[in-house]
Amino acid sequence: MLAVHFGAGNIGRGFIGQLLQKAGYEIAFVDVNAALVDELNERKMYRVQLATTGKPESVVEGVRAINGQDVAAVAEAIATADLVTTAVGPNILPHIAGAIAAGITQRLTVHARPLNVIACENMIGGSEKLKEHVYEHLTESVQAQAAQWIGFPNAAVDRIVPLQQHADKLLVMVEPFFEWVVDSSQIVGEVPAIEGVTYVEDLAPYIERKLFTVNTGHAVIAYLGYQLGMKTIDEAMRDDRIVQATRGALQETGALLAAKYGFDPQVHGQYVEKILGRYTNPLLSDDIVRVARSPIRKLSQHDRLVGPALQCMEKGMNASYLGLAIAAALAFDYPEDAESARIQASLKEFGWENTLHNCTGIPAGHPLEEIVREQARRLKEWSGSH
C-alpha cells in the first residue's frame, strides 16, 4: 500500500507519517524543501522521539520523498496511491492542489478506483477546502469521474510538535497524546484501516471540541503571556493568573460544547485537564510568538476566540475570559508578524472600536464588545504590574 503525504515537516513525519507506517503503508513524502527530500531519499527512514520521561524512540522505515516542484513525479505517485494525506498548513493547500489534480486526472485516465484525500490541517473543513482548490484544476469530465471515485473526508487532528533542533535533521520529537478523527460519511470505497484513527459519522463536535479547547487554550496562554513579557508556553503556565484565565476560558467553551453537542461535562472536564497538562510539559515548550502569530486569522469570527465567545453570548453564557483573550490578541504588538503589524497600524489610524469590528466581525454595539472593552482595561492593569 502506498500513501502520498504532502508536507515532510515535523507534523508530517512525527504524526501522520508514523501512524501510516504503523498501518503498513509505504510513504512517499512530497515537500519543496530539497535538502529534506534528499535526506529522506538517502536514508529511507527517520526516528520519532516521545516528549516524556526517558524520551522513548521509534523508527519509521519504508519512506521516500518527491520534490513538490516535480509535478509529473507527484502525479505519477498519486495515480497509483492508496491514500493521500496533507499536513502543509491551511495557506499552502491552494499551492498543492494543481499537483493533486494532475495525479487524479492521470489516475482516472488509467484505471478508475477509489482514493481518499485527507487534509490533516489545523482548520475546519480542510479536505473540503482542498477539494474546491483541486476541482479548479480538473476538466468537467474528470470532475464528474472524481465525484464518483475520489473522496475528500474532513478530519480533525491534534498533536503538539514543539519547535526543536537536533543534530539529526530527520529526528522529530512529539508529545505522547494525539487525536486523528476522520469523517467516515465522506469516505469513498473502503475505510482505511489505520490504528489510532477514530472514524465518526459527524465530525463537527470533534472539530469544535479541539478548536475550542486545544487551540483556544493555546491562544489564551500565548496572548496573555506575551503581555506579561513571557517567552514560552510552559513559562506562562507558571503564572497563576494565566492558569486561572486559561482554565476559565476553557470552562466557558466547555459549557458551550456541552450545550451544543451533549458532551458529558465530567468527561469533557477530564479532557480539559489533560490539555492543560500538555501546556505545562517543558519538553513541549513552544515559543509564545509562534503560537500567537497570525492574530487576524485567529481573531476571525468563526475561529478559536471570537467564535466561541459569540456563541456563548447567544446562549446567555459567560464569555469574560474569552473576552480577555480577545483583548490580549488585539494588543499583540510584534512587528515581525505581518498581521500583528496590520492590527497595530489599524489601532493607530482607526481606533480600538473600528479595529475590533473589522478584525473580529463582532457587530457594533454587540454585548461582547463591552466585555472585550472591560477586559482590555483589566489587561492594562495586568501588564502594568509585571
UniProtKB/Swiss-Prot annotation:
Keywords of this entry: NAD, Oxidoreductase
Pfam family, one: Mannitol_dh_C
EC top class named in words: oxidoreductase
Protein origin, superkingdom: Bacteria
Segments passing through the bilayer: none
Sites where the protein binds NAD(+): 3-14
Gene Ontology MF annotations: mannitol-1-phosphate 5-dehydrogenase activity
Gene Ontology annotations for the cellular component aspect, listed alphabetically: cytosol
EC number: 1.1.1.17
GO BP terms, alphabetized: mannitol catabolic process
Catalytically driven reaction(s): D-mannitol 1-phosphate + NAD(+) = beta-D-fructose 6-phosphate + NADH + H(+)
Similarity field: Belongs to the mannitol dehydrogenase family.
NCBIfam families xrefs: PRK02318.1-2, PRK02318.1-3, PRK02318.2-1, PRK02318.2-5
HAMAP family the UniProt entry points to: Mannitol_dehydrog
Name this protein carries in UniProt: Mannitol-1-phosphate 5-dehydrogenase
Gene that encodes the chain: mtlD
